[in-house]
Every structure is written in structure tokens, then in C-alpha cells.
Amino acid sequence: MKPVWLRRKLPDAEALARMRGLLRRHGLHTVCEGALCPNQGECFGQGTVTFLILGNTCTRSCTFCAIPTEERPPAPDPGEPERIARASAELGLRHVVVTSVTRDDLGDGGAGRFAETVQALRRISPEIVVEILIPDFQGSVESLRTVVKSTPQILNHNLETVPRLYPEVRPQADYGRSLLLLKRVKDLKPEMPTKSGLMLGLGEKQEEILRVMADLREVSCNLLTLGQYLQPSGKHHPVVRFVAPEEFEEFRVVGEKMGFQAVFSAPLVRSSFHAAEFFEKAHSPQSAQRAQREK
């Protein structure tokens, strides 16, 4: 049974239906729906959304994720970037998050589609803040260079869990490769803010979480999200424990002392939850001063 702090208010049914109608009208997918995010009612009610590009079927089989898997998903839709840009304009979004399924079947892993989507958003809404949440592109520097050159305001790549749990939770991923990706972003464009996130409750230990946080600071990661893992179905990795809100708060305090510009740490936090608010907090004078002190 889930603890009381994970209970959510019923979403605004009218706002939910309106958002879903808009997404269907534009033929778009969201990670909010695909990953069964517990916050989608709140986000859709506020007119915020995380767009999912490159289809809604993944080539990997992470045991925490609800998105369906397939060795060779359908070819990407070339009209996707423009439709995302039009939907964003229709919603009046000031901060857009774009993520994707992992497409190991594509030569560039979908990097070109990320770049096209950023460019399409900028053409329609030049002032919009674009945040991208990318896969590891199997370690391809060229693919990473493609997305960095498109100059999103934030580049996010989630480590998801601690190294020890990768074989059972992310069997086709590699902790070192993901950490290196975040380092390479800074090598390519030092001023680009990077962001990463972890799910807690998969069986990790406190010292392992702190080690991952330290690893992220060693590659100059700026922003961190920590949230509770929730099992999508009985076939997925079990929840080993529910982490209390007080523990999440302790990690937030430690993270800020480590020098992260901003840390969102709470049971229902997800990597793009309240992304605009997180971005603004990260650019506040207080967070800039904190980051400067920890350099």
C-alpha cells in the first residue's frame, strides 16, 4: 500500500480532456502518458507537457519503465517537429520539455530529430525556453554534438539509479557512459546547463546515492531531480521501499551544499515536473552565488 504522501488529488477532468484532445489533434505523444507519470493530471491542468519524439515504442527494456519496447519500431514521423512547435504555440508555453524513446535502430540515435525540434520551436516561438531530455546515443560523440549545436537552454540526461543496480534496472545502458555524456556536454559547450535525475526506492543505499550525486558534481552537472520510483505494473521492477519526504529533503540540502544550482527532491518529483519553476530557481541570484562558492 502506498503511503499517504504519495496520494494525489483527482485531476481536473475537463482540463485533462482538453489537453488530450489537443495532443491527439496534432498527432503527438507525451512521456506523461507513456510512462504513466503520477503528475500528468496536475501538469495537463496547468497546460504543461513533456513531448515524446521518435514514436512511442522504445528499443530498450529498462525494468522500471512503462513505455512499450520493440526491436525495430516504426520509422520516425518527419512532420513531428513542426507539430510540436504548433501545439506549443497553441498552448502558449514558455518552457517546453522534449524527450524521446531510445532509438538504437537509428544511425544517429535520433539526435537529428532533437535538433530539428529545437529549431522548429525557435522559429515559431523565439522566446521559448527549450529543455531536452536525451538518451545516451550509445556513446556517440557526433550525435551529442548535433544536439548541443542546436543550443537548447537545458540538456538533461538521467542517470536514473546507482551503478550497482544498472544490470537489473537498465541492462542496455552503462553508468560510466551516461556520466561521460554529461561531461562531454561541458567539453563541447561549457556554459550549457546540464541536468540529471535519480529514482529512489529501487534498492539503492544512502551512500550510493551520495556517491552518484558527487559523481554528477565532478562532471559539473548543474541541476538535480530526485523522486520516488513507482512500479508501473506487476511485471516491472518492484518498489523496494518508499522513501520518506524528510529523507528527500535531506538529500536536497546535501545537494545544494555540494554545489548544484538547484535540487528538486520530493517523492512525486519527476525530471520535468515544474520544469519552468526549476529553471527559474536555478537562475536565481542565490543559486548562482551558491554554485560560485562551491567551485
Regions found by a protein language model. Name each.
Residues 1-50, 54, 66, 82-86, ...:
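Auxiliary Fe-S-binding modules of radical SAM enzymes
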Residues 38, 59, 163:
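Nucleotide phosphate-binding site architecture
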Residues 52, 101, 131-135:
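Structural motif
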Residues 59-100:
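Glycine-rich active-site/cofactor-binding loop and its immediate structural neighborhood
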Residues 71, 97-107, 137-140, 153-175, ...:
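Conserved radical SAM core fold
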Residues 96-98, 130, 155-157, 224, ...:
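Hydrophobic residues within beta-strands of alpha/beta enzymes
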Residues 108-109, 275:
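Metal-dependent catalytic neighborhoods of phosphoester/phosphodiester hydrolases
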Residues 109-112, 140-149:
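Distinct, well-ordered alpha-helical segments
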